[in-house]
A protein has these predicted regions:
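Charged, low-complexity intrinsically disordered segments
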Residues: 1-177
Length: 177
């Protein structure tokens, strides 16, 4: 089963939470969306010590590992806020970084799909090759990041219509990054 017209599969690269990019959110400067997510996770649970360690860390892998050490963490509470947090982060990321925003606009009109074979929450739990061969109804993951990026792209296309139109008509490859 092939989905090249409908989907834009990504895992790493510009649409990844680990992509280096400077952004400001709530007066705090971050070097990756992963850093922002882990910081806001720590702050949600009022763990200011780990939050500061996350800000001091420059590597997204280290930032993620620190995010797993948040004291007082509750999966149920995180589930209530995680999508809104990641939405706000990605809106800031693409609004404040024109080059990344243009790359996001180049995926119009395709639905963004995080083809991560290891992530069934933010991704689909399959790599792009296997996803293209599988009915989307059977993808094991939720694709929360892909859904959020699709929403952010739509909203930013309304905010930057000329840029979105120019980028989406460039005929970029949309199957993978």
């Amino acid at each position: 089963m092939n989905h090249p017209v409908t989907y834009h599969f990504f895992w790493n690269g510009p649409f990844s939470q680990w992509q280096t990019c400077h952004m400001e959110l709530d007066g705090v400067v971050f070097n990756t969306a992963e850093q922002a997510m882990m910081y806001l996770k720590a702050m949600l649970f009022d763990d200011k010590t780990v939050a500061q360690e996350i800000l001091d860390a420059t590597d997204p892998g280290q930032q993620k590992a620190l995010g797993r050490k948040v004291r007082g963490f509750s999966e149920a509470q995180w589930d209530l806020y995680k999508e809104e947090i990641v939405y706000r982060i990605n809106r800031a990321k693409y609004r404040q970084n024109k080059g990344l925003r243009r790359k996001l606009f180049q995926t119009i009109p395709h639905m963004m799909i995080e083809a991560s074979p290891v992530d069934t929450i933010w991704g689909i739990g399959l790599d792009a090759k296997n996803a293209a061969l599988t009915d989307p109804e059977l993808w094991p993951g939720q694709n929360l990041l892909g859904q959020i990026l699709t929403q952010v792209r739509t909203e930013l296309a309304d905010e930057f219509p000329d840029e979105a139109a120019a980028c989406s008509s460039e005929g970029q490859e949309t199957l993978n990054d």
